[in-house]
Amino acid sequence: MSAPMVGMVVLVVTLGAAVLALSYRLWKLRQGGTAGIMRDIPAVGGHGWRHGVIRYRGEAAAFYRLSSLRLWPDRRLSRRGVEIVARRGPRGDEFDIMTDKIVVLELRDTTQDRRSGYEIALDQGALAAFLSWLESRPSPRTRRRSV
C-alpha cells in the first residue's frame, strides 16, 4: 500500500470511530433524564455553567453534559455523599441562561475519592425529583441487623 492510501484508511477509520462515539453519546442523551445546569465550584460570576441531563440510578446520579463527547457521565454524584450546603436563586449574569424560576443548589460531595463542590440549577419539577432522590437515602444511623 502506498503512503497516501494508508493515510486515507487511517482517516476513514478515525472519522468512523468519531461518528460512532457521537452516535452513542446522542443515544445516551435521548434515553431521557432530568434537565439541569451544573458547574464546579469555586466559580466566578456566571461562568462555568454546563447544560446537561441528570439520570438517577439507585445510589448514583449521573450528569451528562450536552456538549461533551465522553462515553461516560461527566459527573457522578453518590446519594450517600451529597450534602446540600445552600439554596438560592440565580443572580447577576446567570440570568442570561436561567429564569427567575430556577433554583440553584450548592452541593458538597463528601465521598472519599471526590471531596469537591458543585452548583446545580434546576426548575421546580427537576428540583422535586432531585430532592426526592436525595432524601430517600437510608439514614447514616441505620445499621443492618444480623439475623
Curated annotation (Swiss-Prot):
GO CC term (a single one): membrane
Alphabetized InterPro entries for the sequence: DUF2550
Compartments in which it is found: Membrane
Domain of life: Bacteria
Sequence intervals crossing the membrane: 3-23
Predominant location category: membrane
Recorded family membership: To M.tuberculosis Rv1312.
Membrane topology: Single-pass membrane protein
Alphabetized UniProt keyword annotations: Membrane, Transmembrane, Transmembrane helix
Protein's name according to its UniProt entry: Uncharacterized protein ML1147
